[in-house]
């Protein structure tokens, strides 16, 4: 729906909402039976009163929109970091200190309701964790912001004193590492913290084997390419400074400054047998050429995040959040073809851009009664992007202004065994470019979450949501670059948003030794952005358009079992069937596949061991069908004292691990490629996790809101 009206500039009091029904739940406290009572402010603004209790056989509680996983003594003592505890949830894959979902949906990670990163979780000890909330569909304010699934980690109260933590991972067979360090000092009413994470990567032996065929002009171009070994490098660094001021349990002020930097260089070199066939005469010529593709980018991004929260009573609470983000980006894409030492084609696309954005959000929560909550929400964002794009000779300046306003409301409650949450949002998205002028769109987005609890061990749930995805700034510029000597890619300044609607029904069961969660998911993407091909001036042109229509069905079963009472051994499995169909763009395509993972873990008092195997499923990519890497790993670690853990492991990519992609029949382009990184075969990794803390426990407040603009403006 389009309108010239704009909701930009909304500055409103927003009502926070409980995404699940209010219920008293039994905390599993500590493994020794220690009593620990606290109020945990969860992601949606919901307040769960965790009553004092000792451990029971139950490790999972069921709510209308999420499941609450409790950690026992074994879980706290045998996992090195909070990030590793996410492996307890079937369907979440933790690899290289990054947490992702095996079903391909996005995963939002929160800490006490505050969006955080995998790197930050790698600097949090499991001893600090009280519980983990897992949302198959994110709560209202996050779902309306485009989040898929979500986890929210609830921690214990911090204390007066300080803490230092190191998390070091280094590969001894290749230049690769995930290293992080943090220090926090907590005074009576103030916490000061600094955190650094760095991920330097250099992978030798990288190459792509490729078959390519397409028409351009009156010729058919066919290339059989063999990848030549090159070095792929990617360096990521992030520093954050935190200041939290807590006047009392009902008031908090938080300010955070972050500085992120990334530099990536991903060249591809290939020796090719090139055949050009005249479609009129059917005459052909064959020659040997060398192709080189250049893909380089760099960005620097500072951000300031200020958050204020005030709880006026048990029934009313107000939160306000302001975020300012800037990006300074540079990128280079090039295609070069040589016959021996003679250049046949040289094309370079350079982009130099800056982006400035601001976010204002406020949340106000109102508890009507113990079983009923009502809320409203609002958020406004605005950004300005400047891009200079050129080929080294001609430079084009493109400015893109975007603004977004969102109003949402939600009502939640419970009756008998039923709990429910119903919400809706009205969203305005507007943008303006020099090439296409002003565009305004208004969207309506409903949200329904239902749950029926049969007993303390089992429940059934249903979720429905509708979300809008906006195109990235880099997609709407004026840049162009070559993928092959007759294949040119152009940006599209007239891209529009597209909508995803998904429905999920599932069942969950748990007892002292078993947890299973089968579910069925169907989603539909309307007006999806996909590549469209055309022929002009003897070239094949690729340009993104809002022409796709995708429908997908997924059926999955996740589970975790502890078969022996006296042996700390557990098996986590996840299996999924995926059926996707995409129409539009002149090349309909579909894919059906099976995928999943299995992880076996031994958790002793001092020693831990873990082995995992991942079988990826196929999915529809931009111009074809892709398959992820098939790999496995094993690792072991030993705990030394209370503060140190050292370990070693090996990751082994199996023969079919190579990431592959191919186009569907009928596509204007026939392509099949396989990528490989031989230097990462049999990667041996050493780990060291050290944490040290001092001080005493005090009361503190949980923080709930944070935002970030994750679109750097790059392609």
Locations of regions flagged by a protein language model:
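Outer-membrane beta-barrel signature, preferentially recognizing the C-terminal barrel domain
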Residues: 468-517, 524, 541-553, 674-682
């Amino acid at each position: 729906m389009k309108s010239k009206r704009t909701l930009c500039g909304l500055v409103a009091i927003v009502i926070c909402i409980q995404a699940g029904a209010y219920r008293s739940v039994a905390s599993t406290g500590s493994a020794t039976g220690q009593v620990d009572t606290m109020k945990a402010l969860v992601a949606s603004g919901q307040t769960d009163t965790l009553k004092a209790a000792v451990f029971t056989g139950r490790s999972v509680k069921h709510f209308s929109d999420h499941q609450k996983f409790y950690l026992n003594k074994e879980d706290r003592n045998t996992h090195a970091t909070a990030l590793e505890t996410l492996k307890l949830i079937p369907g979440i894959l933790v690899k290289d200190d990054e947490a992702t979902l095996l079903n391909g949906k996005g995963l939002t990670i929160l800490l006490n309701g505050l969006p955080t990163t995998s790197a930050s979780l790698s600097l949090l000890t499991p001893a600090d964790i009280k519980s983990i909330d897992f949302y198959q569909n994110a709560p209202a304010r996050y779902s309306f912001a485009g989040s898929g699934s979500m986890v929210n980690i609830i921690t214990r109260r911090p204390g007066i004193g300080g803490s230092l933590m190191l998390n070091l991972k280094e590969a001894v067979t290749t230049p690769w590492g995930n290293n992080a360090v943090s220090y926090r000092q907590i005074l009576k009413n103030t916490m000061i913290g600094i955190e650094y994470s760095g991920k330097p990567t250099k992978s030798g032996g990288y190459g792509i084997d490729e078959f390519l065929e397409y028409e351009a002009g009156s010729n058919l171009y066919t290339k059989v390419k063999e990848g030549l070994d090159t070095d792929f490098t990617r360096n990521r660094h992030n520093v954050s400074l935190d200041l939290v001021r807590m006047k009392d349990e009902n008031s908090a002020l938080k300010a955070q400054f972050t500085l992120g930097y990334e530099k990536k260089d991903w060249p591809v070199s290939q020796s090719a047998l090139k055949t050009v066939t005249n479609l009129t005469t059917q005459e052909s010529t064959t020659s040997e050429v060398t192709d080189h593709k250049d893909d380089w980018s760099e960005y620097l991004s500072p951000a300031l995040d200020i958050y204020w929260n005030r709880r006026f009573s048990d029934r009313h609470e107000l939160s306000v959040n302001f975020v300012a983000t800037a990006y300074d980006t540079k990128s280079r894409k090039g295609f070069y073809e040589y016959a021996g030492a003679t250049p046949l084609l040289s094309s370079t696309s350079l982009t130099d851009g800056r982006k400035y954005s601001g976010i204002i959000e406020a949340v106000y929560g109102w508890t009507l009664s113990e079983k009923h909550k009502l809320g409203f929400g609002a958020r406004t964002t605005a950004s300005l992007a400047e891009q200079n794009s050129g080929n080294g000779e001609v430079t084009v300046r493109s400015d893109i202004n975007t603004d977004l306003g969102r109003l949402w409301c939600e009502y939640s409650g419970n009756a008998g065994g039923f709990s429910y949450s119903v919400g809706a949002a009205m969203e305005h998205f507007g943008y303006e470019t020099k090439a296409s002028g002003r565009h305004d769109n208004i969207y309506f987005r409903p949200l329904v979450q239902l749950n029926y609890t049969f007993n303390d061990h089992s429940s059934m749930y249903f979720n429905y949501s509708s979300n809008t995805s906006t195109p990235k700034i880099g997609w709407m510029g004026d840049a162009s670059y070559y993928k092959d000597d007759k294949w040119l890619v152009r940006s599209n300044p007239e891209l529009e948003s597209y909508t995803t609607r998904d429905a999920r029904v599932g069942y969950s069961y748990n007892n002292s030794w078993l947890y299973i969660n089968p579910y069925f998911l169907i989603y539909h993407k309307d007006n999806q952005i996909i590549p469209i091909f055309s022929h002009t001036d003897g070239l094949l042109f690729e340009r993104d358009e809002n022409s796709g229509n995708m429908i997908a069905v997924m059926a999955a079963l996740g589970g975790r079992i502890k078969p022996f009472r006296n042996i700390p051994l557990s098996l986590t499995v996840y299996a999924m069937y995926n059926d996707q169909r995409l129409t539009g763009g002149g090349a309909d395509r579909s894919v059906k596949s099976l995928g999943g993972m299995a992880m076996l873990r031994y958790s002793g008092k001092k020693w831990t061991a873990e082995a995992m195997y991942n079988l990826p499923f196929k999915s529809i990519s931009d111009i074809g069908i892709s398959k992820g890497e098939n790999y496995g790993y094993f690792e072991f670690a030993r705990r030394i004292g209370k503060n140190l853990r050292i370990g070693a492991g090996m990751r082994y990519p199996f023969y079919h691990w190579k990431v592959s992609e191919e186009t569907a029949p009928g596509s204007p382009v026939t392509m099949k490629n396989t990528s490989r990184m031989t230097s990462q075969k049999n990667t041996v990794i050493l780990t060291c996790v050290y944490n040290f803390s001092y001080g005493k426990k005090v009361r503190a407040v949980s923080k709930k809101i944070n935002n970030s603009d994750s679109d750097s403006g790059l392609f």
